[in-house]
Structures are given as structure tokens and as C-alpha cells.
Amino acid sequence: APECGERASGKRCPNGKCCSQWGYCGTTDNYCGQGCQSQCDYWRCGRDFGGRLCEEDMCCSKYGWCGYSDDHCEDGCQSQCD
């Protein structure tokens, strides 16, 4: 049964996870990408997203994406860079 969104009476996912077009919670592009119903910016951060910090202490890259790679945590990193 759907966990969130229209098919679940508008319920939101826990821990800021995205609600997919099919009503399931997750954090990958399948949930947060096209058709996402709510909390679709889970992987987004930084100045273009109201200064939002990443979940789980991930780094915020210069392009506003959350992750743990050197591309996220080094040159131009916006927050939680160490």
C-alpha cells in the first residue's frame, strides 16, 4: 500500500524523504525526481535552497547537491565540508 502522497491521504514521508509519484518513500532519483509529490529536494542544499543543510552530515557541493564524494566536500563546498 502507498506510504505517502495522494494515495495515502496526503501523508508525508519520515526523515524528510521524498514521496514518489507512486506514493512510496525514498531518497534516490526514482523517488525525488520526475513525478515526486512532496519533500522533493532531499538531495538539494545551500544558498539556492534557503541555506538548507544536508541530512546525515553529507557535504553540500558548490552546485547545491548533497553527497560524500570529493566533488561534494572539496572545491567550493558550501556546508558540512569536513
Swiss-Prot record:
Q: Which domain of life is it from?
A: Eukaryota
Disulphide bond pairs: 4-19, 13-25, 18-32, 36-40, 45-60, 54-66, 59-73, 77-81
Q: Where does the record place the Chitin-binding type-1 domain?
A: 1-42, 43-82
Gene Ontology terms describing biological process: positive regulation of cell division; positive regulation of mitotic nuclear division
Give the matching PROSITE patterns: CHIT_BIND_I_1 (PS00026), CHIT_BIND_I_2 (PS50941)
GO molecular function, a single term: chitin binding
Q: Which InterPro entries match?
A: Chitin-bd_1, Chitin-binding_1_CS, Endochitinase-like_sf
Pfam assignment, any one: Chitin_bind_1
Description of how the protein assembles with itself and partners: Monomer.
The record's listing under PANTHER family reads: CHITIN-BINDING LECTIN 1
Instruction: Briefly state the protein's biological role.
Output: N-acetyl-D-glucosamine binding lectin. Shows no hemagglutinating activity towards rabbit erythrocytes and weak activity towards trypsin-treated erythrocytes. Has mitogenic activity towards human peripheral blood lymphocytes (HPBL).
Name of protein: Lectin-D2
